[in-house]
């Protein structure tokens, strides 16, 4: 049983992957909250309720934006660690999501410093559906990755 840099990478990745799973679960809950608030017909004509709904939507979008850069950074750190540890299969499994994160980050709205999740555009049903599907796909990826990292960590520790 040997403790190598690859084993350390897998251990750190397990902890960080658990945090990414919680980030994505929070995204799913937030999008469901937005969808429910969007479809709620109660008090549609009440201006006070409309202001309250808008403030709630802006608050949720602000919290969503705060999780984007940490999620992308943590996943980039995964890829960098696996590159340094020469874990090519694991790096190959993570590269597609890394490229998607880079594409998504560099194709953010050009009108400001907002990464994404604008309060006005997120209430478009198509964008909301897309964001929710994206979150479910990321949850599946991170869950499968978590168990792959767990297996790889044990294999790396036992094989030497």
Swiss-Prot record:
GO terms for biological process: localization within membrane; negative regulation of anterograde synaptic vesicle transport; negative regulation of receptor localization to synapse; regulation of AMPA receptor activity; regulation of membrane potential; regulation of NMDA receptor activity; synaptic transmission, glutamatergic; vesicle-mediated transport. It is a multi-pass membrane protein. Its main location: endoplasmic reticulum. Brain. Expressed in the neocortex, hippocampal formation, and cerebellum (at protein level). Keywords: Cell membrane, Cell projection, Endoplasmic reticulum, Membrane, Postsynaptic cell membrane, Synapse, Transmembrane, Transmembrane helix. PANTHER family: CORNICHON-RELATED. This is Protein cornichon homolog 2. It comes from Rattus norvegicus. The gene is Cnih2.
